[in-house]
Amino acid sequence: MRILNYTIINLVMSKHLLLNINKTQKGIIHIIGIGGIGMSAIAEILHNSNYKVQGSDAQSNNNVDRLQKLGIEVYIGHNANNISQAQIVVHSSAIESDNVELVTARNNNKTILHRSDILAELLRDKYVIAVSGSSGKTTTTAMIASIFDHSNIDATVIVGGILNSYQSNSRLGKSDIFLIEADESDGTMLKIPANITVITSINDDHMDHYGTFDDIKHAFSQFINKADFAILPDSVGINYDASNSMMFGFESGNIRASNIKQHANSIEFDVLIDNNHRIKNVVLSNTIGMHKVSNALAAISVAIKLGISDAEIKKGLLEFQGVARRFSLIADIKGVKLIEDYAHHPNEIYATLTAARSITKGKVIGIIEPLRFARIRNFFDEFIRIFMMFDYVILTPVHPPEDKPIPGCGIDDIQKALISNGFNNTKIMNDALLISHFISDSTSPSDIVLFIGAGSNIAKLAKETAALIAEVKV
């Protein structure tokens, strides 16, 4: 494989991780919130690298089940006794400072690491490709992984979603090449020692952490400028070093898409590279929507930078199997498609709705679980504007359940605002049986029902509803 500007072929195969804390290999690393999508990936990589890992979570989920099947001990519920044998305790920003395990670790002078710290340790002395962005980073990382899997790059992959090809959110490779999704929500991306950084998009999310949109853009600028090479959208609007970067997009940039054709479950397009080379008839499987083409362009940019051949790029995207909960078909019942999507920012919900509209002339019904009251407050008007673009909207309770309510930002407030703006096609529901009856009575062949949200409840609701509708429609 030809390499541009980097000499990956000289990287030494590695049999150990966590260079700075390798003395703990006979001890125990305890991960609080181990069932989270990011934490479970780290836990699996550590376990597969022969570290003794355990963890705890408030409740069981699919990630917990997967880890337990690997032999990782997971405690359900947080308790001081859970960490009695642990030498290192790992937590994320989602864990409150008064969490009993975190407090106990602090009082007993145990080594406490933030998720970003242990991730940085995992990546120390590796060749790192870090993908970040306000939206699209999981899908983009998955596309890069698929290209790697169909070339000669045996990379370790850590991603914030379940890759259908892996049935996991991580993969331990045999080389020193690490492909990771870098979380921007709490600034984790700034701790990542990356060789290549990728930005998929930038919007005004996570204002509670950053303060202003300018602060968000500044953080992304820091992220790309500390790497050896950066890949970013052509319209991102941040400071960057043009001599060490590559841009992708539809109108300008080094890597551009043209002749885009949306098929039933794939997208076909051509790629123009620096105005003098074209990859024709690229087929991106298991994807719908123009935003996925943008993700693919970012992935192709990484591949081009690493010298991966056109044939390997095309093969990787043709064989792309998608990511769970990213416009994922749950069921097709007599022509009514039930689709699940992780969208939770207004821009993401709009992209998901647009993707659905691109493949049907029927109705599009949104069953939406808002994520956090603060996000509703920050984007209330945007949510109302976009929800009114659906044919019908069913609102479910805000996730997570323990999130502190903010006056004027509940789902009843959203419903009132929709109605006051003349949109009466809205209900509040949280029962799969009631939702299944509504869908059965209100849909026709070619209609699409979108289950939208990042929480675990909407995912459970989607599967239960699909099963009930299948019974009714038989």
Curated annotation (Swiss-Prot):
Catalysed reaction equations from the record: UDP-N-acetyl-alpha-D-muramate + L-alanine + ATP = UDP-N-acetyl-alpha-D-muramoyl-L-alanine + ADP + phosphate + H(+)
UniProt xrefs under InterPro entries: Mur-like_cat_sf, Mur_ligase_C, Mur_ligase_C_dom_sf, Mur_ligase_cen, Mur_ligase_N, MurCDEF_pg_biosynth, UDP-N-AcMur_Ala_ligase_MurC
Record-level Gene Ontology MF annotations: ATP binding; UDP-N-acetylmuramate-L-alanine ligase activity
GO CC annotation: cytoplasm
Compartment(s) where it occurs, according to its Swiss-Prot or TrEMBL record: Cytoplasm
Alphabetized UniProt keyword annotations: ATP-binding, Cell cycle, Cell division, Cell shape, Cell wall biogenesis/degradation, Cytoplasm, Ligase, Nucleotide-binding, Peptidoglycan synthesis
Primary residence: cytoplasm
Domain of life: Bacteria
GO biological process: cell division; cell wall organization; peptidoglycan biosynthetic process; regulation of cell shape
Keyword Metal-binding attached: no
Pathway: Cell wall biogenesis; peptidoglycan biosynthesis
EC number(s) from the headed UniProt entry: 6.3.2.8
Binding site for ATP: 133-139
NCBIfam families: murC
Family of this protein: Belongs to the MurCDEF family.
Function according to Swiss-Prot or TrEMBL: Cell wall formation.
The protein, known as: UDP-N-acetylmuramate--L-alanine ligase
Organism field: Wolbachia sp. subsp. Drosophila simulans (strain wRi)
